[in-house]
Regions:
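Membrane-integrated ABC transporters
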Residues: 1-31, 36, 44-59, 65, ...
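Transmembrane helices of ABC transporter permease
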Residues: 10, 14-27, 62, 68, ...
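Helix-loop-helix
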Residues: 48, 147-161, 231-305, 309-310
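An intracellular "coupling" helix at the cytosolic face of ABC transporter transmembrane type-1 domains
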Residues: 98-102, 118-127, 131, 135, ...
Length: 582
């Protein structure tokens, strides 16, 4: 929890006022047994109704003051816990925004969701109970023991012996509970990851009739979570009964010892009543402490998991502004670039190996190759979604690791393979990167992306609502909206990562023709599976198993690149290859 102390500081007033009000409540609660003893000794035994009446009224007033103090504590504790929880959740969200793809891969999205929700709630709950129960219980415990000892030292020693036993039991339970709560949170991560994955791929599950299989997989992880929760709950379940048993044994012992004392008038009846009340307060306080310490054990696990995220240094470090001239995207070069996801420099772990090429403004660079060749990984290095393991990517003479991320990414437009759309209108999705875009600009890029006609036919046009992840749109429609979104920001470097795979040949042809006039001032990268998508590019890079095995124009590659010839032959047939060679 020490790493999260900084989130408490802004709400120090609530953190102080809450316990302060609780101290008043404890003080009033400690008065009640004394007042009860006075009523019994001087009112009931002496048969003085006036004492009973006036002392009874005083007890009611004390109870009301205790109530007011308790409510005040609850209000301040709630405000502190809710605000602290909100700040931690926001800090986690902001931290995740700084993560590279590699950092997100490390934690897994399901685990990050658990940390931002369930773990924050655990810490939030701890703050609440700490400002209430963890103040009330120790103070009431100490106060009750002191009052009991002052009333009767011998009886008080019985109470102290009982407390030592209870504390020993509590330490044992705490020692075994911490690792169990840690395992529960890990199992919850697995459940959330499975749910998220299943919901994201529900259409695939249904299409392949895999509901039964997925249900079984969920059953296994859910069962693991349930069993871990049951094991942890056993310690919680043992806590209260054991404490209650020891408390009752203590009360019986006190009554057995004090009974003869009352008969001999060595102890007044009212004092015995007050003493038993103090014993009950002390022991119930310890039970409360044990319950709260279980919360502490559980929250410590959550706090550590939160701190793991907050203390993670992003694998991609943002560069400071050097005051150099603005990035124009005139020239880009890859120099001996190697990349592996685990930053290993061994050849067998490398996804990309010794990548070298250059491109200048006005050039279109197409990248083609088999699935898994490293095409998408290569272009993801340009906006620093991942960082190179060795070598460098240089834009306008500057290593991109020395360019502030905001400046770098502001000049790069990327249409990802997965055309992700946000919940909202089509207009909102197109203007995502330029929220103040004019209507005519939105329509212009939509026309270039060959999506304007489709949008115009919708009942609400550009204000048509898009479902989560664009579920109410086809793959081709989502791709074209994503292309329009990227074109609107007018990037210096345009990256289209297999972004026309869902388009038919005619629509793709129209899109390529419309883009020609727009991208003449850009450096454009096109990743494609189809040769027809990159045949007009000034430079085509052919990739195979993480390396560039060919570079040149379409005609040059047909003449000297075996891999390119194989791809061409698989798509167009032997006759066309022969024809190109004539």
């Amino acid at each position: 929890m020490s790493g999260l102390k900084g989130y408490i500081k802004p709400y120090w007033k609530f953190v102080i006022l809450g316990p302060l009000f609780m101290l008043f409540e404890v003080f009033f609660d400690l008065l009640q047994p004394r007042l009860a003893a006075y009523i019994v000794n001087n009112g009931v035994v002496e048969r003085d109704f006036n004492v009973i009446e006036y002392t009874g009224i005083l007890m009611v007033l004390v109870a009301l003051l205790s109530l007011i103090a308790g409510v005040g504590c609850n209000i301040f504790a709630s405000r502190a816990s809710q605000n602290i929880g909100g700040d931690i959740r926001e800090a986690l969200y902001k931290k995740v925004q700084t993560f590279s793809f590699q950092d997100i891969d490390k934690f897994k999205s399901g685990s990050l969701i658990t940390r931002m929700t369930n773990d924050v709630v655990q810490v939030q709950t701890l703050v609440q109970v700490a400002l209430q129960g963890l103040v009330r219980a120790p103070c009431l415990l100490i106060g009750s023991v002191i009052m009991a000892l002052l009333m009767n030292l011998r009886l008080g020693l019985i109470l102290l012996g009982t407390l030592v036993v209870l504390i020993g039991v509590l330490i044992v339970l705490m020692r075994f509970s911490y690792p169990l709560f840690s395992k529960v949170q890990q199992k919850l991560d697995m459940v959330n990851t499975r749910i998220q994955e299943n919901l994201a791929g529900i259409r695939v599950v249904k299409a392949f009739v895999r509901s039964g299989y997925e249900t079984k997989r969920f059953h296994n992880v859910n069962r693991g979570y349930t069993q871990s929760s049951i094991k942890a709950s056993r310690f919680i379940a043992l806590n209260a009964p054991i404490m209650t048993l020891i408390m009752n044994v203590c009360l019986v012992g006190i009554l057995l010892y004090s009974g003869p004392l009352v008969w001999r008038d060595s102890v007044k009846v009212g004092d015995l009543v007050a003493f038993i009340n103090y014993v009950a307060q002390a022991l119930s306080s310890l039970i409360m402490v044990s319950g709260r310490l279980m919360d502490v054990s559980r929250a410590n696990v959550s706090a550590q998991r939160i701190q793991d995220v907050l203390s993670t240094e992003p694998s991609i470090v943002d560069a400071k502004s050097e005051g150099k001239s603005a990035l124009l995207g005139e020239h880009i070069s890859f120099k001996h670039v190697n990349f592996s996801y685990n930053n290993s420099k061994t050849a067998e772990d490398s996804i990309l190996r010794d990548i070298n090429f250059e491109a200048s403004r006005g050039e279109t660079v197409a990248i083609i190759g088999s699935t898994g060749a490293g095409k998408s990984t290569l272009v993801q290095l340009i906006p620093r979604l991942y960082d190179v393991t060795s070598g460098s990517v240089v834009i306008d003479g500057r290593d991109i690791r020395n360019i502030p991320l905001a400046e770098l990414r502001h000049n790069i437009g990327m249409v990802l393979q997965d055309s992700f759309l946000f919940t909202g209108s089509i207009r909102d999705n197109i203007s995502l990167g330029k929220v103040d875009a004019k209507e005519e600009d939105i329509i212009e890029v939509a026309k270039i992306a060959q999506v304007h006609d489709f949008i115009s036919k919708l009942p609400h046009g550009y204000d048509t609502k898009v479902g989560q992840k664009g579920v109410n749109l086809s793959g081709g429609q989502k791709q074209r909206i994503s292309i329009a979104r990227t074109l609107l920001i007018k990037p210096s470097i345009l990256i289209m990562d297999d972004s026309t795979s869902a388009l038919d040949s005619e629509t793709e042809r129209k899109l390529r023709n419309a883009l020609k006039g727009l991208i003449k001032d850009n450096i454009t990268f096109i990743i494609a599976q189809r040769i027809s998508s990159c045949i007009d590019a000034e430079k085509i890079l052919v990739m195979d198993e993480g390396t560039i095995v060919g570079s040149g124009t379409h005609q040059e590659l047909l003449e000297n690149c075996t891999v390119y010839q194989d791809i061409y032959r698989s798509q167009f047939g032997e006759r066309e290859v022969s024809y190109e060679h004539k």
